[in-house]
């Protein structure tokens, strides 16, 4: 069971980081398709996308609590995240405005992930592939930073980072596609 959860986590992580990098890269150009009133909303998308990524990883770890019939641990870790979110919103909103909400959301989901990653080790020893996880996180955060701070030639750098994330995770995404297509082929 540990091997199964570790493999699924690795594949899931690969897919999520590739999607996240792609969404971050495309968020600003896609805003041109909307009315001018919505263009400025692009600045909220990058951090909310990473927050959503960590929420997805949290839900994966939540499945371990459910399998092991330890749902109260899920409640405790989510409560810690909720308290952190409230405190961080109180701290960030006066200083950085609406971007404080997105930053607080990201940091809160990251906290929940870290708590669950440590906490679930006592229930099921998953290999989180920490080097892969940290590398993906650094690459996507660099992409977000370049875009939000509008560094010179940010579009080129963000494109290169997205290609890098996708190349780094290619085997994982390909493995997931093979499994999905293999199952679909057997059903037909």
Walk through the language-model features, giving the residues of each.
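Membrane-interface helix-loop junctions in multi-pass transport and translocation proteins
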Residues: 42, 72, 78-114, 146-161
